[in-house]
Amino acid sequence: MTMTDPIADMLTRIRNAQSVYHKQVEIPASKLKRELVDILKREGYINDFEYIDDNKQGILRIELKYSDNDEQVISGLKRISKPGLRVYAKKDEIPRVLGGLGIAVVSTSSGLLTDREARDQGIGGEILCYIW
């Protein structure tokens, strides 16, 4: 069976693993997912990730992050642009998530960027998801 929205599947796997306090979660890999997970690591939402080559498409093993008193670092993940309804924003229309406390992941001509990076570079694109 084919997957219609691999990004939504990845976000759901992370959300489900965090809700039951798993230390790590494995998801099928792709270039886009790798870039998205790299943003999560750079922004401090996950500890680390590694790519495992299984001679097929590969697997991304994501090490989830919790605070000292076992609270989830990621409190919310929301898919914005979906296969049935794409959402685009110009450079001056890129949204702020929770007044700047969260991030919006934007797919641009320069690759995946956070909302801040896209605003700084002055480029718009497709709003993939919100993370807070």
UniProtKB/Swiss-Prot annotation:
GO process terms (BP): translation
Keywords assigned by UniProt, alphabetized: Ribonucleoprotein, Ribosomal protein, RNA-binding, rRNA-binding
Organism of origin: Natranaerobius thermophilus (strain ATCC BAA-1301 / DSM 18059 / JW/NM-WN-LF)
Presence of the UniProt keyword rRNA-binding in the record: yes
Signal sequence coordinates: none
Organism ancestry: Bacteria, Bacillati, Bacillota, Clostridia, Natranaerobiales
InterPro entries per UniProt: Ribosomal_uS8 (IPR000630), Ribosomal_uS8_CS (IPR047863), Ribosomal_uS8_sf (IPR035987)
Record gene name: rpsH
Transmembrane segments: none
SUPFAM superfamilies assigned to the protein according to its UniProt record, in alphabetical order: Ribosomal protein S8
HAMAP family, sorted: Ribosomal_uS8_B
Assembly and oligomerization: Part of the 30S ribosomal subunit. Contacts proteins S5 and S12.
Pfam families: Ribosomal_S8 (PF00410)
Function summary: One of the primary rRNA binding proteins, it binds directly to 16S rRNA central domain where it helps coordinate assembly of the platform of the 30S subunit.
GO molecular function, one term: rRNA binding
Listed GO CC annotations: ribonucleoprotein complex; ribosome
Protein name: Small ribosomal subunit protein uS8
Entry similarity comment: Belongs to the universal ribosomal protein uS8 family.
